[in-house]
Amino acid sequence: MKLEMICTGEEVLAGQIVDTNAAWFANTMMDQGIECQRRVTVGDRLEDLISVFRERSLEADIILVNGGLGPTSDDLSTEAMALAKGETLVENSIWRQRLEDWFARSGRVMAESNLKQALLPESAIMIDNPVGTACGFAVKFNRAWLFFTPGVPFEFKQMVHEQFIPFVKQRFDVSGDVALRKYLTLGQGESSLADTLDKIELPEGMTIGYRSSMPHIEIKLFARGIGAIDQLDTIETQIRLLLGNAIVADNKMSLAEEIHALLVDSDLSLSVAESCTGGMIVSQLISFSGSSSYLHQGLVTYCNESKVKVLGVKPETLDVHGAVSIATVEEMAKGARAILDSDFGLATSGIAGPTGGTDNKPVGTVAIALATKEGVYSQMIKLPRRSRDLVRSLSTAVAFDMLRRELLGQAVIVDYGSIGRFEK
């Protein structure tokens, strides 16, 4: 089966907005063992849309079309599909009623232009959009099925999961001999990882791919065919031996997702005190439902006074060692843990930049501590000073990995490769 994607919209084509839908879609389908083999972006011009629908429908088996289903004059995907196939547009009575009910429930008067969203090519199969007013639909044209979705990200993603993936599986054999394994890494760049893994001789039908999503690089091991699948365990063993501590999670999108799962299963609690990360640790954790079962509190103690008054950091510790120090961050972690008698206290304090660094503590210097009921683990690391956001996100990731390793009973302080460490 050959899957393709057509993205529509002048703002996407002109780079005025980043097309996150396309990247998300390709990654989501890869998780299903289905590769998106081509992606085309086209603007809001009727003749261009017609041309690309005709061209790609001769090559692909199924095409997901994203965008252009709204009520405005530049939403042209539906009209273009009808013209490409030589069909008229027909009002779908079910969707018209859905629109009228939706506006009635919201207490709003429906503008006449919204009825455009109920017009579909005459051969189209209506596809439900459970969270929006733009009607999805599917059309068989030449050799391909074209499946139309709205551009609004949360509508698009829900339709992919609830409508598109089942649609594909009903019509195509996607249970073929494919398998995917993913490894989330920390502390090494994409080129460094690739140089290391190039030493592995891959069997026919197996490929290694890389996806950068700072502060992580995701490695994807993709196998096609029984022969390649049978050798996945062998290749995975080689990958783990070569990368060692750089691998921080399997089949997860982020370290926060891994930490969330581990804490939910462990029945243990966490308090967090953040300075340079500014709430990033807690923000990532509470994006997951159920985080209240383990997260006691998140404190952003940015100034020295708050470190003293809220966390109980000794003034003399700050005077002697400074805010960015092992001594200070250990007291922050212990103080955060003690407030609610949490099982763990996690703390960060650093210099995110671009200003504030010194010769002894340059930008990118970050102290991190993990307090447990038995003691405290701490380290002061040297991070690349490319941007403030990168320092904060890398600090968050290292803090998460310290906690992950403690939860798994592993060594908490480890070397990652490109992340340096100050001697205590």
UniProtKB/Swiss-Prot annotation:
Q: State the family named in the UniProt similarity comment for this chain.
A: Belongs to the CinA family.
Name of this protein: CinA-like protein
Question: Which InterPro entries does the protein's record reference?
Answer: CinA, CinA-like_C, CinA_C, Competence-induced_CinA, MoaB/Mog-like_dom_sf, MoaB/Mog_dom
Q: One Pfam family name from the record? A: CinA
Which superkingdom is the protein from? Bacteria
The scientific name of the source species is Shewanella halifaxensis (strain HAW-EB4)
**SUPFAM superfamilies under this entry?**
CinA-like, Molybdenum cofactor biosynthesis proteins
In terms of NCBIfam families, this protein maps to: cinA_nterm, molyb_syn, PncC_domain
